[in-house]
Amino acid sequence: MSKEFPITISSWTLGDQCKFEDRVIAAKNAGYEGIGLRAETYVDSLNEGLFDKDILAILDKHGMKVTEVEYIAQWAEEHRSYEQKYKEQLCFHMCELFDVKQINCGLMENYSVEYTAQKLRELCQRAGKYIIGIEPMPYSGIPDMKKGWAVVKAADCENAKLIMDTWHWVRANQPVDLSVIEDIPADKIVSIQINDVWERPYATTILRDESMHDRLAPGTGIGCTAAFVKMVKEKG
């Protein structure tokens, strides 16, 4: 396995209808080094009758690891639901169990930079040693890298960082150009997600459906993957 940057298949890429061991086997056979796991998918594994020790044994059996944990949402709500509070704690537990350093997070609700930064600061304090990776998504309250960096910068937390995703990048109409991230230190980018997009996007009202169900493999869409990777490499 790559010591620092394991090649990981995201949890949603493998859907939510397969058993845990089938998920691990599929990722292994496809050449991935690790799997991402959503809190919901972890709960599904427990619902299969597996315990934490069984999950770890399956991973060890196939020489795989969980290398990504997600997904904390609604973290900027003034009054968070118990479901979201519990999901957040579950993500912390998963990081401890699988020795994962970061949690992917998104925010659908749209608030000011100042308010969002304050709520991100509170989340980072709760996360402690774990990195909070903020994922800009064009249909969300943090639609692009510009607002994403403004929020992370204003939060001023060592464990607040950003995620770059090819699909979200293109659908946010951001040019694949270093100028977009020129003010963002390279060490504030915690994860790079590589995929591809169709030339014509879904309608704005259903853009999230495309994000969830109709992405393309790297290099099979409009051809931005190589340029995106080159940009990331040049950034350092």
Question: Residue locations for each model-derived region?
Answer:
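Short, flexible segments with low predicted structural confidence
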Residues: 12-13, 30-31, 123, 171, ...
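Short, hinge-like loop/turn segments at secondary-structure boundaries
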Residues: 26-27, 53-55, 84-87, 121-122, ...
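Short, charged helix-to-loop "capping" segments that act as catalytic/coupling loops
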Residues: 16, 127-129, 135, 172-176, ...
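Gly/Pro-rich active-site loop or hairpin
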Residues: 46, 79-82, 145-149, 170-236
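N-terminal pre-domain/capping segments
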Residues: 1-100, 157-161, 187
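Active-site beta-loop-alpha junctions enriched in small/polar residues
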Residues: 10-14, 38-42, 71-74, 107-110, ...
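Short aromatic/hydrophobic contact patches that present stacked aromatics
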Residues: 8, 104, 217
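Active-site acidic/histidine proton-transfer and metal-coordination neighborhood
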Residues: 21, 58-65, 76-164, 171, ...
